[in-house]
């Protein structure tokens, strides 16, 4: 059995964590960072880039770079690249595949299982799509866990067995959640949760972009939103400015050559954004976090004074205005500073993976469903079977009847939401129960059962008590993928993984070959006096052979040329070694002679004629 990891699949960044000796460890990616940008790019040469490498080339490859795909998960969104449509699940799977690959490189063994986190306010279709993304990435998704719950799990287990009420304020790159939990004696119980799936750090970035566009247009008369590359540069500059304003009172945004005027003269963007101005243009976004907060406190039935700890989650909570608002909402309570807002969710997910695999004992996680679930009944009314903030897993049944005489079937339409009129809520799916025996209206008894599993995914069954006939569906949104589609995407992802691996190996061979040529020539230059001209020529010929092979696409030819250069280099090394050894011996002889000279008496040498006569002169 392979290892299990915890994954925080974020809008902006993603994190993977694993249990090592019972302790959660955040795994650094191949680039050495503990967070991986949730960015996927399709390079012109066919290579799929994920993470920092994808983010780095976004400006020059705008149309083929996808970011913040989490905002589209569970919808019918797709993106066309090279005449192929990619769903949000497939793009998310690319990020998950990189996290899986980096974890395997760190652990030295296969990663097969994962707990993946989602915003607490995610609907059923979004949870289902996240699970599908994990499957496409080759992961067995043990559980879908709410992000605030995972954060509380990571935070709470460090605090011992004392019972406490924790508020988790989670403002990420694309979503916002707030949850109230009770923790104690190994039990993490969610009391209430609320949120906004359309609110996150991306929106703060966009306000800065809009501000810059307006400033530039007023001074230059040019709308930068019409220029895709300029817009991408603005987005990147806005994100940096937002981060800078968390620690500084102002941020300078300088973008040279942002565009050209009508006469093709280059134009520069140079603006200074103060923290006060930034807070002014984003105040309404901040205000939107208040309603979910108040709703959670009301639903949980607690007063603000009963909250023991406040935990901030998500990089966007680093903004001073957010911290101040949380303090204001919680009666001046200082948020906990001992938690890394970028990593705590992944750590909690790794702990939950450990619980599910039996590696972590005596921990029970009791999560809730964020929205009410029900069906449409006569008059278009939303009849709720499961109220929001019900602990999951759960199962509820209710008996309904027909509205017309001799009605042969009933249409079951499943909705999620809080509105009294069914159509004002989110339609999760519908199915038909047929074969109802003819009878006056009000006589047939149709039992509808809602079953929510621990992942928060809904299963609905309708059963005619008279005939025993029943029909069951696992709710899938209109964008949901069939098993055949998931299987196809898994195969496609595996094929791309093989292609990517082959491409990486090819690049490594090329890089090593180029490095060998450089190092060999440098070595020859440094030891020029010790190598014969004949040997130098052979080595240079072999080096040119490698360079020639690198111009082509034949990997085996490159390897053969490298092998030849290695052979010639070894001969050169041998010759240099022998030359050094000979020089060493000569020096040793000279030293010995010098030592002998100390006992020699100076005298003239008188040649012996007889000896001369006896010499064989040539």
Swiss-Prot record:
Q: Mind telling me which HAMAP family this protein's record contains? A: DnaK (MF_00332)
Which gene holds the coding sequence for this protein?
A: dnaK
Q: Which domain of life is it from?
A: Bacteria
Q: Which InterPro entries match?
A: ATPase_NBD, Chaperone_DnaK, Heat_shock_70_CS, HSP70_C_sf, HSP70_peptide-bd_sf, Hsp_70_fam
Q: Please provide the record's keywords in A-Z order.
A: ATP-binding, Chaperone, Nucleotide-binding, Phosphoprotein, Stress response
Molecular function (GO) terms for this protein are: ATP binding; ATP-dependent protein folding chaperone; unfolded protein binding
Q: Could you tell me which residues carry Phosphothreonine?
A: 175
Family, per entry: Belongs to the heat shock protein 70 family.
Where does the signal sequence lie? none
Record-linked NCBIfam families = PRK00290.1, prok_dnaK
Name the chain's protein.
Answer: Chaperone protein DnaK
Query: In which organism is this protein found?
Result: Corynebacterium glutamicum (strain R)
Q: What PANTHER family would the database entry show?
A: HEAT SHOCK PROTEIN 70KDA
